[in-house]
């Protein structure tokens, strides 16, 4: 079963919603409370329910606000939730198709300083993924505690998938060896867009590139964008990866497993 996730004939971003997801949608949305896990029950308590028209308005408004100010992380988060439902169902389907992905969906791990022992990761051998991630956080002065909570998705299962995507963003940076400057953020957004199909990622990739300085834009077109596209052709889906169980794995072996070639 572990292999099924990697046998998808088309990249996730180009897959259509398959018919079997209709029943999954119904089951996930209408399940009795006693059949939901702790994350799902807690999400339903704080979920903000909106109508289709309100969703349209929020999507348009957050899109405009994100373009005007890319630092409005609340608007970027809102955009992701109001435009990404179909892509999230596809991601959920992909995760359910592999043993590792199913384990994530059952255990619903969270990534923050309360759940991860960063001191332990820092003490690991430097060639491990755990040490690579800890070094990324330190070098870029970032913390896993800054991710926005999900509010506007109807289905709690999709809410977890979106939560997982957000909390894994820095892990993707680390495994790609990409810092957090604007050029690399745009590049990572392209990788995420092509790997997940999330409209928000495409928007960040396309419109983020517009804000690059001339020198950055030349490097982006000459090296970074071609690298992101070429890597994405061979890269395995990242969302089914249980990163927290890979801390001790050699980071180069992990990259080879995922089909990632670093930018030279």
UniProtKB/Swiss-Prot annotation:
Membrane topology: Peripheral membrane protein
GO biological process terms, semicolon-separated: ubiquinone biosynthetic process
Catalytic activity as recorded in UniProt: a 4-hydroxy-3-methoxy-5-(all-trans-polyprenyl)benzoate + H(+) = a 2-methoxy-6-(all-trans-polyprenyl)phenol + CO2
Assigned GO CC terms: extrinsic component of mitochondrial inner membrane
Domain of life where this protein originates: Eukaryota
Extent of the transit peptide: 1-26
UniProt binding sites for Zn(2+): 169-170, 173, 185
Enzyme Commission identifier(s): 4.1.1.130
Swiss-Prot/TrEMBL cofactor(s): Zn(2+)
Pathway as given in its UniProt record: Cofactor biosynthesis; ubiquinone biosynthesis
Cellular compartments annotated: Mitochondrion inner membrane
Keywords: Lyase, Membrane, Metal-binding, Mitochondrion, Mitochondrion inner membrane, Transit peptide, Ubiquinone biosynthesis, Zinc
Ranges that cross the membrane: none
InterPro entries to which the protein is assigned, alphabetical: Coq4, Coq4_euk
SUBUNIT field: Component of a multi-subunit COQ enzyme complex.
Family in the record: Belongs to the COQ4 family.
HAMAP family in the record: Coq4 (MF_03111)
Known function: Lyase that catalyzes the C1-decarboxylation of 4-hydroxy-3-methoxy-5-(all-trans-polyprenyl)benzoic acid into 2-methoxy-6-(all-trans-polyprenyl)phenol during ubiquinone biosynthesis.
Entry protein name: Ubiquinone biosynthesis protein COQ4 homolog, mitochondrial
Organism: Drosophila grimshawi
């Amino acid at each position: 079963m572990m292999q099924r996730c990697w046998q998808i004939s088309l990249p996730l971003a180009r897959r259509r919603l398959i018919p079997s997801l209709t029943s999954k949608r119904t089951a996930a949305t209408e399940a009795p409370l006693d059949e939901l896990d702790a994350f799902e029950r807690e999400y339903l308590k704080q979920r903000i329910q909106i109508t289709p028209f309100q969703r349209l308005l929020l999507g348009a408004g957050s899109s405009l606000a994100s373009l005007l100010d890319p630092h409005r992380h609340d608007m970027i988060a809102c955009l992701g939730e109001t435009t990404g439902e179909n892509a999230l169902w596809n991601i959920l389907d992909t995760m359910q198709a592999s043993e590792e992905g199913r384990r994530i969906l059952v255990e619903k791990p969270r990534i923050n300083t309360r759940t991860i022992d960063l001191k332990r990761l820092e003490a690991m051998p430097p060639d491990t993924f755990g040490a690579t991630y800890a070094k990324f956080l330190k070098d870029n002065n970032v913390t896993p505690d800054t991710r926005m909570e999900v509010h506007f998705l109807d289905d709690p299962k999709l809410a977890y998938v979106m939560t997982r995507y957000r909390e894994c963003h820095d892990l993707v940076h680390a495994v790609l060896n990409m810092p957090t400057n604007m050029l690399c953020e745009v590049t990572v957004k392209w990788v995420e867009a092509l790997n997940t199909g999330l409209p928000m990622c495409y928007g960040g990739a396309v419109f983020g590139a517009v804000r690059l300085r001339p020198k950055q834009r030349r490097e982006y077109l000459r090296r970074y964008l071609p690298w992101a596209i070429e890597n994405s052709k061979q890269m395995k889906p990242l969302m089914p990866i249980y990163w927290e169980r890979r801390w001790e794995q050699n980071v180069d072996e992990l990259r080879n497993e995922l089909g990632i070639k670093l930018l030279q």
